[in-house]
C-alpha cells in the first residue's frame, strides 16, 4: 500500500512538473515573440519617419542571419552559436534607430546631402548608441549591448575610414561588421 501510494504520488508530481514546464516554455516563447515584435515596430517607426518602405529592416535582419550562419560555418573565432546569431540578427533591426534624432529635412532630402548635412546624418550612430545607454536597468542586457555595438559602429570600416570612431579591423565588434556588410548590400 505504501509503495503504491509513493508511485502514485511520484506520477502525479511528474505530470504536474511537465504541465509547469510546458506553461513556463509557453510564457518564455510569448515573451520572446513580444520582444521581437516591439523591436520590429520601433524600427519600422524610424523607417516610416525616414520615408522608407519598411523593407530595409527586414532585409538587414535576413541578410545578417544569412551572413552569420555562413561565418559560423567558416570559423569558430567569434563563438557564434545559434542564440548569439539570433540575438545579433534581432538587434540588427535597431541599427538606424538614431535616425529618430536627425532632422526630417535631412532624412528625407531628395538628392545628395551637403557636407554639413552629411555630418549631421552621421550623428545617427552616436544618437542611437546614446539612446540605448539611457535604458537604465536594461542597459546590461545582452540584446541591448549588441544593439548598442551595432548602432554605434555599423558605419565603421575595416580600414579605419568609417565613423564615428575610426575603428580598425577587429576593433569593430563582429555584430557591427556583419550588419555593416548587410547595410551596404541593401543600400
Language-model-detected regions and their locations in the chain:
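N-terminal membrane insertion elements
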Residues: 1-22
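Generic low-complexity, intrinsically disordered sequence content enriched
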Residues: 15-17, 24, 46, 75
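Short, charged amphipathic alpha-helical "coupling" segments at sensory-output junctions
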Residues: 22-37
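Histidine- and acidic-residue-rich, metal-dependent catalytic cores
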Residues: 33-187
Amino acid at each position: 500500500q505504501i509503495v503504491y501510494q509513493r508511485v502514485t504520488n511520484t506520477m502525479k508530481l511528474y505530470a504536474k512538473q511537465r504541465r509547469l514546464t510546458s506553461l513556463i516554455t509557453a510564457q518564455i516563447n510569448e515573451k520572446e515573440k513580444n520582444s521581437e515584435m516591439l523591436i520590429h515596430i520601433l524600427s519600422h517607426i524610424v523607417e516610416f519617419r525616414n520615408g522608407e518602405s519598411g523593407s530595409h529592416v527586414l532585409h538587414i535582419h535576413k541578410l545578417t542571419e544569412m551572413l552569420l550562419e555562413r561565418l559560423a560555418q567558416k570559423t569558430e573565432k567569434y563563438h557564434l552559436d545559434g542564440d548569439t546569431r539570433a540575438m545579433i540578427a534581432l538587434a540588427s533591426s535597431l541599427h538606424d534607430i538614431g535616425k529618430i534624432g536627425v532632422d526630417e529635412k535631412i532624412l528625407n532630402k531628395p538628392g545628395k546631402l551637403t557636407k554639413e548635412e552629411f555630418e549631421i546624418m552621421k550623428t545617427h550612430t552616436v544618437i542611437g548608441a546614446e539612446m540605448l545607454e539611457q535604458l537604465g536597468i536594461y542597459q546590461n542586457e545582452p540584446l541591448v549591448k549588441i544593439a548598442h555595438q551595432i548602432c554605434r559602429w555599423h558605419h565603421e570600416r575595416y580600414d579605419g575610414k568609417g565613423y564615428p570612431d575610426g575603428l580598425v579591423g577587429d576593433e569593430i565588434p563582429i555584430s557591427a561588421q556583419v550588419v555593416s556588410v548587410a547595410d551596404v548590400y541593401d543600400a
